[in-house]
C-alpha cells in the first residue's frame, strides 16, 4: 500500500504490480463510487475469454455506457463534449471508434497489466483516453461491451463542476504526447518485444 495518497493512477498501478506478483491472469477494475454494477464483473470476465471471428482474444475489455444494450446513464453537457472530442482523437489517431473512452470499468489480461505495471508505461495521474491511444497504437486488442451503470447517490465526482473542462485540456495534450511517442518516435517497441518473452 501507499503510505500517503499518490493519486488515482498510482493507486491503479499498484494494483497491477500486485497482480503481477501474485501471478494473476486477469484484472477487472471498477470505480469505487458504486456506479458500476457488480453484474459487469462476470460479463467482462467471460468476454476476456471469448475469441473474435479471427480467433483472437481481447487484451482489454471496456464496459461502455454508450453502446446499444447499455443501461441509460445521464451525462452532463461538459462531459458529453469531452467524450465526443476524445472519440474523435482516438478515431483519428488509431482508426478505432471507442464509444466510452473514459470508462473506469475495464478488464485486462496478463499482457496488459504486466505492461502497465512497469515504470513510465502508465499515467500516474489521469489514465483514461490517453492509455487507450497508447495501447491501440502498440497493437493491444481492445473490445467494448455494454455496461450496467447506476447514478451516483452520494459523494462528489472528481470531474464535477468546471473540472471536466480542465481535464479535457490536460487529456488532449496527454493524448497528443502519446501519439507522438508511439507513432513517430516509436519509443515503446522494445518494451513490447520484452513483454512477448513472457508466457502465460
Regions found by a protein language model. Give the residues of each.
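Catalytic donor-sugar/metal-binding loop of nucleotide-sugar-dependent glycosyltransferases
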Residues: 96-97, 120-123, 132-150
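Acceptor/aglycone-binding surface of glycosyltransferases and processive sugar-polymer synthases
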Residues: 3-22, 26, 38-125, 152-162, ...
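Terminal low-complexity segments of carbohydrate-biosynthetic enzymes
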Residues: 170-200
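DNA-recognition element of transcription regulators
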Residues: 129
